[in-house]
Swiss-Prot record:
Predominant location category: cytoplasm
Catalytic activity line of the entry: alpha-D-mannose 1-phosphate + GTP + H(+) = GDP-alpha-D-mannose + diphosphate
Keywords associated with the record: Cell cycle, Cytoplasm, GTP-binding, Nucleotide-binding, Nucleotidyltransferase, Transferase
Lineage: Eukaryota, Fungi, Dikarya, Ascomycota, Saccharomycotina
EC numbers for this chain: 2.7.7.13
Name of the featured protein: Mannose-1-phosphate guanyltransferase
Length: 362
């Protein structure tokens, strides 16, 4: 089988982190985001993976090529000269994706979940449709495009309703699909939306089905959702692979993932819902909640870090406090006793006075 990961462009929603690394290489759960997907695809028997990119492919090539041998897959970069939307990349990579008649997994690189690729492939084969969308249930369907099913045929999609005013269902497109190679014949070589231009054709021909996703799901393409997705990921890890989580005495509230190379003072309080990356240093009496500390960062004595993504090589000073979905880019310094609330701080900046309201610090 084959897989296409829609990597896309600049990752502006996740700035300032993506000013340093392309979004797929930003660590989620201490591993590059895209590695979670490559591993899951390989586990389901995928042998050819295409990464559809239009921004800084050269940075990703060297990093991702080493995973080919590790996971027994061939990774091809399909570089768009202009953004081709969500369907155009399938046409651009047609040579690889249509080399045999096995189905193609398609997924957005921002999506984190329990990737049900094997179950999806089995369902797709049984349904007899040309394509299957993975659907996830949401609490507020009025914010999304909702899937409405055929009354007579289970899982057959009848139509999509964009941001419905009245309740018509609570299942939405989760950004994962499986397609027969023949679907590529419906796509033109131009910027095209698979959701708005390709799927309606399949719906009209009664060839599009949905598969219900069990477990967690999150689009982690922006900081608020990156942190929420981290909570969901750690919760899933606590149920499936609890030994991966830290259980040292400094853990407070559980669900903490710590790289073995991190140095944490025994008097610190860490948790719940924290990821601490390689070579991170946490000082005496520091308090960290619902945050991600990327590699080589430091939280000094008695600092309080909450709802924060601390970028690579960044430093939070003694008695400083961060909160309110704060994101520090690469090599940022928060001086001692400074309060930062909801700021996005670009790389190589030093903050020496309080930031009390949401702001972008350039």
């Amino acid at each position: 089988m084959k897989g296409l990961i829609l990597v896309g462009g600049y990752g502006t929603r996740l700035r300032p982190l993506t000013l340093t690394l392309p979004k797929p290489l930003v660590e989620f759960g201490n591993r590059p985001m895209i590695l979670h997907q490559i591993e899951a695809l390989a586990k389901a028997g995928v042998t050819d993976i295409v990464l559809a990119v239009n921004y800084r492919p050269e940075v990703m090539v060297s990093t991702l090529k080493k995973y080919e041998a590790e996971y027994g897959v061939t990774i091809t970069f399909s570089v768009e000269e202009e953004p081709l939307g969500t369907a155009g990349p399938l046409k651009l990579a047609e040579k690889v994706l249509k080399k045999d008649d096995t189905p193609i997994f398609v997924l957005n690189s921002d999506v984190i979940c329990d990737y049900p690729f094997q179950e999806l492939a089995d369902f797709h084969k049984t349904s007899g449709g040309k394509a299957t969308i993975v659907a996830t249930k949401v609490d507020e369907p009025s914010k999304y495009g909702v899937i409405v099913h055929d009354r007579d045929t289970p899982n057959l999609i009848d139509r999509f309703v964009e941001k419905p005013v009245e309740f018509v269902g609570n299942r939405i497109n989760a950004g994962l699909y499986i397609l027969n190679p023949s679907v590529i014949d419906l796509i033109e070589m131009k910027p095209t939306s698979i959701e708005k231009e390709t799927f309606p054709i399949l719906v009209e021909n009664k060839e599009l089905y949905s598969f219900d996703l069990e477990g967690y799901w999150m689009d982690v393409g922006q900081p608020k959702d990156f942190l929420s997705g981290t909570v969901l990921y750690l919760t899933a890890l606590s149920k499936k692979e609890p030994k991966k989580l830290c259980n040292e005495k400094f853990i407070h509230g559980g669900n903490v993932l710590v790289d073995p190379s991190a140095k944490i003072h025994p008097s610190a309080l860490i948790g719940p819902n924290v990821v601490i990356g390689p070579n991170v240093v946490v000082g005496e009496g520091a308090r960290i909640q619902r945050s991600v500390l990327l590699s080589n960062s430091e939280v000094k004595d008695h600092a309080w870090v909450k709802s924060t993504i601390v970028g690579w090589n960044s430093r939070i000073g003694k008695w400083a406090r961060t909160d309110g979905i704060t994101v520090l880019g690469d090599d940022v310094e928060i001086k001692n006793e400074v309060y930062v609330n909801g700021a996005k701080v670009l790389p190589h900046k030093s903050i020496s006075s309080n930031v009390e309201h949401e702001a972008i610090i350039m």
